[in-house]
Every structure is written in structure tokens, then in C-alpha cells.
């Protein structure tokens, strides 16, 4: 039952993102170091990432890493923006376990699944895009009739490239 529920939820979130104008991407689960640096995961979060020594590659901590790196060397015209992508992926982090007062009640795993939405937007419109994405996620949680709240992360929980970050 759990596997079918998970598959249904993944489809629900991907379908809703596509209906909201996001292009679905099937990201790779293994990336090079340049991809990690390009999204601020490296060097900041290297201790939480799994490294494949023989090939000098990393398992993705989030689909954001390969999705945004699809555009790493692209220069956009303003008329091309926004670029909206969604992706489902397994994610891999070394932060497994349940520990400490800050994660009470959470059971952290080495592997977990996520559906992400990503926008590439002109800097003048980035905060507006962030609010749009938060509203999109909130509407989905409400459609599922789940209780929710927004947690705004503090600076110590974000990569050095982040200005704001929220979790619904």
C-alpha cells in the first residue's frame, strides 16, 4: 500500500506542476563536482554528500543540482524567462538518523524521494517567483487536506548561495 501511495503522490505533484507550466525533467542521480559547486552544495555541504571516488562523482542531494546545471553555461534573453522545470528524483544524503532537539520527530534517511519545482528567473523577479512557488506548493498540500506551515530556514541551514529558503 505504501509504494502505491508514494507513486500516486509523485504523479499528483508532477501533474500539478506540469499544469502550472513547469516542464518535467528526468534528472541524473549522479553529477560531477562542477554541478555541486554551481548550486552551492560544494564545498559547503560536501560532508553530507556521497562521493563515488573511482569516478569522482557525487550522488545528488536534491534534484535541484542536476536540473539547474542543465542551464549552467546558458545565457538567456529576458524574453526566454522564466524557465520552469519540475523533477522527481531519489535524493541521497549522509545526514541519516534521528538526533538532537532541532530534528525531534524526524527520521532522516540516507535515501529519500522528492518532487521539486525550479524556476530560472530574472533577478528583478526572483522574490516574486519564490512567492509563486510557495503558493503552488501550499495549494497542493491544501488539496490533500494536510496540515502545514511554512518554515523559513536560518542562514546556518542554507548554502552560501542562498538568500532565502523556506520549507512547506
Language model feature labels by segment:
Residues 1-168:
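TRNA-recognition modules of translation machinery and tRNA-sensing kinases, especially anticodon-binding
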Amino acid at each position: 500500500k505504501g509504494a502505491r501511495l508514494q507513486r500516486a503522490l509523485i504523479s499528483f505533484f508532477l501533474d500539478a506542476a506540469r499544469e502550472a507550466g513547469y516542464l518535467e525533467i528526468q534528472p541524473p542521480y549522479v553529477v560531477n563536482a562542477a554541478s555541486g559547486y554551481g548550486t552551492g552544495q560544494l564545498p559547503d555541504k560536501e560532508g553530507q554528500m556521497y562521493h563515488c571516488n573511482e569516478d569522482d562523482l557525487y550522488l545528488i542531494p536534491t534534484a535541484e543540482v542536476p536540473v539547474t546545471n542543465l542551464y549552467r553555461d546558458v545565457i538567456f534573453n529576458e524574453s526566454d524567462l522564466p524557465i520552469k522545470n519540475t523533477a522527481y528524483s531519489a535524493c541521497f544524503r549522509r545526514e541519516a538518523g534521528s538526533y538532537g532537539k532541532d530534528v525531534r520527530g524526524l527520521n532522516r534517511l540516507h535515501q529519500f524521494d522528492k518532487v521539486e519545482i525550479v524556476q530560472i528567473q530574472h533577478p528583478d523577479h526572483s522574490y516574486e517567483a519564490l512567492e509563486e512557488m510557495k503558493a503552488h506548493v501550499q495549494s497542493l498540500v491544501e488539496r490533500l487536506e494536510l496540515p502545514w506551515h511554512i518554515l523559513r530556514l536560518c542562514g546556518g541551514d542554507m548554502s552560501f548561495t542562498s538568500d532565502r529558503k523556506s520549507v512547506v
